[in-house]
């Protein structure tokens, strides 16, 4: 198949969907790969490195979309890309259709086949294409906290590392998933006092097995959260709040319980979600203060670690892309139920129930549109 890799156009997005080694894998299987000019520079990969592995460089995103059967990306599509879409084209990326109604309109209108990384499952009913970015986002979120608490950056002047004779900084991590484990592991390894909260006791038990000794694990309820945020120097949120809920885990009033000028890092960054006062920021302008508390709410933290993130993401997504390219998209979707869970739209039909309910659109199941009995 013909696979096109465009340059990401989101603000401060330095990742790219594929590494040169990934191109080599695709070309060895008879696929043709187009890379947009300088698409990999932000991740440390030159045009020449891609060409050496068999890719062809195109200098126009319009031409790349026109020539490609599969568009292989990192982030969602932006309005300036909508007109490039063509009927039957496969869009393989993080789509996040719930959050971007205009994108959903375009995908349906153009009758493309959208397959979202974030919804693909595995045999354990987990999300293998979220895991690599979640881990990097969690660890990256803590590394950003290290900078934000420095006095020169407007923080309280703390060092988030163990210093002999000095009280340890208190790091509270909400969520024991991949992001939370990443944040807690790094924070604990530097000698901070770390507390992890989750409503899932199985996740807490797993976290206890892998995290360093000394980390405290608490069931996430209102009292425990309030007790923890009173003492926290850094609060790191790593849970995605259910989209149908209108309440919040950390309300605006609860900020009054926190130490003045302490820090919230919202790795999940779902506006109006777990943290009421969260609103998305960018790497250009990452923090703001509300209620006397510093908020760091950048919604693409992994982009700051672009070379690592690109390599990790490509390692995770490439086997699925190879399956689609080898079998053809319909056969791949019919034979692989886990890949099928990622189907967002097909031939003008929305196939993701969650988006249908949220955006009040008609939808069908993937099995219905693929005529799977």
Q: Residue ranges of each PLM-predicted region?
A:
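N-terminal beta-loop-helix "entrance" segment that forms/cooperates
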Residues: 34-57
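An anion/phosphate-binding loop that grips the pyrophosphate of nucleotide cofactors and donors
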Residues: 67-68, 232
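Glycine-rich phosphate/diphosphate-binding loop of Rossmann-like nucleotide-binding domains
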Residues: 6-7, 11-42, 152-240
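Adenosine-phosphate binding glycine-rich loop
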Residues: 118-144, 148-159, 168, 269, ...
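Generic hydrophobic/aromatic pocket-lining and core-packing "Φ" positions
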Residues: 23, 47, 104, 142, ...
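Phosphate/diphosphate ligand-binding glycine-rich loop within oxidoreductases
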Residues: 70-149
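Rossmann-like adenosine-cofactor binding region
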Residues: 209-292
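Short glycine-/small-residue-rich Rossmann-like dinucleotide-binding loops
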Residues: 69, 75-76, 95-96, 221, ...
